[in-house]
């Protein structure tokens, strides 16, 4: 779909003020600064720049784009939007670019007077089934154009165009692309009674789609690095088998082909793709206790990564972009988090507190690990450095009955700024996200279904 969206850089040399007004290092917001002071963002409603006769029937497209951009940048935690009632200009009567270069252009003074750090001016037009979004992002104190781009695509891709622009804004202002073109894969009982199926959705919970229909228990999904494949475990009924088994399947989202890749008797679960997408790390319980194996996408075992000790459970492998492994093991008596190299050597225990530590998740830069830790009768989400130091707690919430809620199954966003997880604080397992320092938390799903083990993809083209 992304190939249908063309991002075209605008020619800004017509306005000499902008051609040389960039920040010297290209970064306007240093990562971490928003924790103490959010930048004030002014974002007037989108202007309709197409034929006036088509404005009314295409208003919904503009509203969808505006709302999506606003939500993305709000969730980023770097911006606070200025209420439109504080605007000093009638933005429906001023152009998207400033005066005097544009005769009816806006005045930077009108925006600096209300304290705006950044200003987004944007317009859109619709011809047939194609929408064009024209955007200008300004740094008000410097009267500088930071980003000018046009985006084109089918009206059905309006949200995706908005997500693309929001990603570009984050890249232009912070130097790091946003996570807004990412997707989430999750197991849920949505619409399936007692069974669980696999679903995908946008990072913000929109566009949810069921991608399995086994009428069974399908769990523990994982994305390939390119977002084109999903591995998951399901208790499918195989022809000729007397019992259902926890088998692993691989779904190719491009072709729709679904392959049974690991069906060894016992557990075949906990998939995590290697950084190059050519292998899967998983837990297999052939023999006695579950151990972690490395497997090709065709199901061929490449090697056994963990080997006991006898009676120990080695589960939930996760692989960093640098190829390091983290997993949960009870080899010391209680389930704790361990790390190892890709071959299973240099094993190190990195958590020592709590009753039960599980579900490790690497940050995209390989510097941090999130996990779920149980202290009393509930789990919470923690983030620590990859060596176990610098641990912080992200979650602490109560249910309506006053008991502590459980927060589980963390997964890092592709930019490393957020952690996604499930929480039963409402009585149902819902999906939430938190900034990596725990200062801001938002609910993603809001329904009466249960969600389990969400996994955040990379940004998907």
UniProtKB/Swiss-Prot annotation:
<dbReference type="InterPro" id="IPR014167">
    <property type="entry name" value="Tol-Pal_TolB"/>
</dbReference>
<dbReference type="GO" id="GO:0042597">
    <property type="term" value="C:periplasmic space"/>
</dbReference>
<dbReference type="InterPro" id="IPR011659">
    <property type="entry name" value="PD40"/>
</dbReference>
<keyword id="KW-0132">Cell division</keyword>
<dbReference type="GO" id="GO:0017038">
    <property type="term" value="P:protein import"/>
</dbReference>
<dbReference type="GO" id="GO:0051301">
    <property type="term" value="P:cell division"/>
</dbReference>
<keyword id="KW-0574">Periplasm</keyword>
<dbReference type="InterPro" id="IPR011042">
    <property type="entry name" value="6-blade_b-propeller_TolB-like"/>
</dbReference>
<comment type="similarity">
    <text>Belongs to the TolB family.</text>
</comment>
<dbReference type="Pfam" id="PF07676">
    <property type="entry name" value="PD40"/>
</dbReference>
<keyword id="KW-0732">Signal</keyword>
<dbReference type="Pfam" id="PF04052">
    <property type="entry name" value="TolB_N"/>
</dbReference>
<keyword id="KW-0131">Cell cycle</keyword>
<protein>
    <recommendedName>
        <fullName>Tol-Pal system protein TolB</fullName>
    </recommendedName>
</protein>
<feature type="signal peptide">
    <location>
        <begin position="1"/>
        <end position="21"/>
    </location>
</feature>
<comment type="function">
    <text>Part of the Tol-Pal system, which plays a role in outer membrane invagination during cell division and is important for maintaining outer membrane integrity.</text>
</comment>
<dbReference type="InterPro" id="IPR007195">
    <property type="entry name" value="TolB_N"/>
</dbReference>
<comment type="subunit">
    <text>The Tol-Pal system is composed of five core proteins: the inner membrane proteins TolA, TolQ and TolR, the periplasmic protein TolB and the outer membrane protein Pal. They form a network linking the inner and outer membranes and the peptidoglycan layer.</text>
</comment>
